[in-house]
Amino acid sequence: VRVYTESPPKLKKTAEHTIDLVIGVFDEASSFERAAIEKALHWGDGELKLRTETGSEQLFSTTSACPKCGFSVPELDPRWFSFNTKQGRCETCEGHGVLHEEEREGRGKNAQVYVVESECTECHGARLAPIPRAVRVSGERYHELTGRSVTSALSRVKSWKFSGDTALVARPVVIELVRRLEFLDEVGLGYLALDRAASTLSGGEMQRLRLAAQLGAGLTGALYVLDEPTIGLHPRDTGRLLGNLRRLVDLGSTVLVVEHDIDTIRAADHLVDLGPSGGANGGHVVAQGSPRQVLTNVASPTGRALARAPEQRAALPVPRGHAMLELTGASEHNLKNVDISVPLGRFIVVAGVSGSGKSTLVRQVLLPAVRQKLKLVTDEPGAFSTLRGTEPVMRALSVDQSPIGRTPRSVPATFLGIWDLIRRVFAASPEAKVLGFDASRFSFNTPKGGRCTTCDGQGSLTHEMSFLPDVVTACPACGGQRFEPQTLGVRYKGLSAGDVLALTAEQAVSVFENHPKIVAPLRTLCDLGAGYITLGQGSHTLSGGEAQRLKLAAELTAGARHEHTLYVLDEPTTGLHVADVEKLVHVLGRLVDRGDTLVVIEHHPQVMAGADWLIELGPEGGDAGGRIVAQGPPRDVAKKKTATGVVLSAEMSL
């Protein structure tokens, strides 16, 4: 758009603009005036553009030009090295590094559309435009450096050597870059690639990333709140994390941490213990003071749990010749041609420092490979050579932390399969028989039942707010009890169907003590430390750990099953109090006791000590990981000087 300088247009401050000054218009190249060229170079700081009638542009520079071909490069600034800016990003993939194409399978109504992701054919995943891709510092390009792990990049940057004027410019930048990379390494993120998408980071990794940023900011007088920052962190690295939290305190800030990790609890200046239990039985400060004061307080559940040695599960032996699931040549991501042996019918823990390849080995290679062998629906497994010994296995599944439902209609009682049984209990009551109610009357998910017609059995109403989050309020007709008045009039032990949905799992165990099929999954849920969950709590409000424990309870009480199942769990201790970890280990042991195989990714010392077989990956994270450093019974691993071996030795008092 050409405008006159006498009446320039108003430009948005937040938008990016390219502004060129027109020096002259010429009919043909031979008519170029020397004075116009000199004027353009003067106003353009040594650069000028030539635009043809077709709209194509060519840049000419007196400072950044190739003497052989004449190709000119504009003056570079940091924006050129960002794939989020117009000049820096690759035009083909718009800075994503990948191309997305739709593929159709089938025809008509049965057609399914898949989005296929492939590497960008122009930048080959670098995400940058040709000019920034060509710039090198000490022989390395920008996208090559950001493709390294934090530890590798730190080592590379420290090796840079500059001289003369370049050293004067580079020195302060390199010092700050090294400082920030060291902060990332110190909080246990040395294995992360610098260009890794933030959306793929775990909650613990994201917290530690923010912590590293705060360490670099050097603020004083701030209040920092962290929720379980040790999630995903190997015990070996907890000390470094605590050291960095202490640095924030030394700077004059206050650090408030919600945490179950024993080392973090003992390192605190002031400890607040809430309880005495969870849910309705919690919410009270039962003890506070120094860790020593709280841990010697008999009223403190945390103090009681730490005052005694945990009761370790009796490990099952793995004799020579025991049936094994053998995976060889796993080489996905950072795995280095890994071979593992998984004893069937045993409790196996896969441990290792953060980024050593645990999740890649178990969730991206082993589980999909087994499911593929069993002809079950699965993602394509990661690279491996062979898989043997799957014959006894009939099922393979991951008991993960994904949501079990996304609406108020899905509740723990329906997920565990006990609401149908409870409906029959109500239908068998004298009041229900007099009124002619059958079990369907007590369903809040069917229109023909006795559900509240105002909220359709959801117990709440959602109000859409323009430009604001939706507001959820209790239904004014049923008061959140999901049923209409006549249905609520039917009672069992003085409780209506709505009252039963408001019970916690612990309370429901005593109410339905004469109904074993109802009590069994609820008791298992209590054993898993989730007895505070109410039967009618919306599944979409459950945390990942709570959803995982509900899935475990459902699997353990699914009835008689003669199918050997391979279960995979990823850090099931997340969010668990130290007193509940012991319960978890014994409940997991029940799966093994009935003949199933359990593979758990975990580095909680108590869980590792309670396993039958331990596989340790390492020795470090990222490129320095991906190898088997120890494999065998926990007592054997504890004798090795590996990261996990040292922790296990202390836990098992060897």
Language-model region placement:
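Conserved phosphate-binding elements of NTP-dependent enzyme cores
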Residues: 1-654
